[in-house]
């Protein structure tokens, strides 16, 4: 079927609601992760790789930061379709390191969603060097819904 687009004003209200929900995510804030953009079924988050907080022993973004960035993008993507999700599994393929001082982003795209499970593909990129850092796939369990956020917009 043809997807009906909501008016831009409504889309902006949904984005603002999801952003407000995630402004209370203490772990995201502690890591310095912020939302860049979102649309129905997709989200992009980013973080500047801080040498004091995020570096591994090789002066690159720690793999835990890369995986955390991907994981946060999945939860936000779920919220864009009105679903409160928790991670069941996330498999991350690390491709290339991102040096400290660079900004990395994770973009998630929902590939399947029903009332119980959401599956998502994620790409993590080094924005300063235009390189692919990691690819991940996640299975998210739906634990609740977010009132006022439709599944399609």
Residue ranges and their predicted role:
Residues 29-31, 41-43, 86-90, 102-104, ...:
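A generic structural signal for short beta-strands and their flanking turns/coil linkers
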Residues 30-60:
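Catalytic strand-loop segment that frames the active site of acyl-thioester-processing enzymes
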């Amino acid at each position: 079927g043809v997807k009906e687009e909501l008016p831009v004003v409504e889309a902006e209200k949904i984005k603002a609601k999801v952003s407000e929900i995630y402004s209370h995510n203490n772990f995201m804030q502690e890591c310095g992760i912020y939302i860049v953009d979102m649309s129905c079924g997709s989200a992009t988050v980013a973080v500047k790789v801080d040498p004091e907080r995020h570096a591994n022993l090789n002066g690159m973004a720690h793999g835990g930061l890369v995986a955390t960035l991907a994981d946060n993008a999945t939860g936000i993507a779920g919220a864009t379709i009105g679903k409160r999700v928790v991670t069941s599994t996330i498999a991350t393929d690390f491709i290339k390191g991102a040096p400290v001082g660079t900004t990395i982003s994770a973009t998630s795209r929902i590939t399947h969603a029903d009332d119980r499970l959401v599956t998502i593909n994620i790409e993590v990129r080094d924005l300063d060097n235009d390189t692919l850092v990691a690819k991940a796939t996640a299975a998210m369990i739906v634990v609740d819904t977010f009132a006022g956020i439709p599944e399609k917009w």
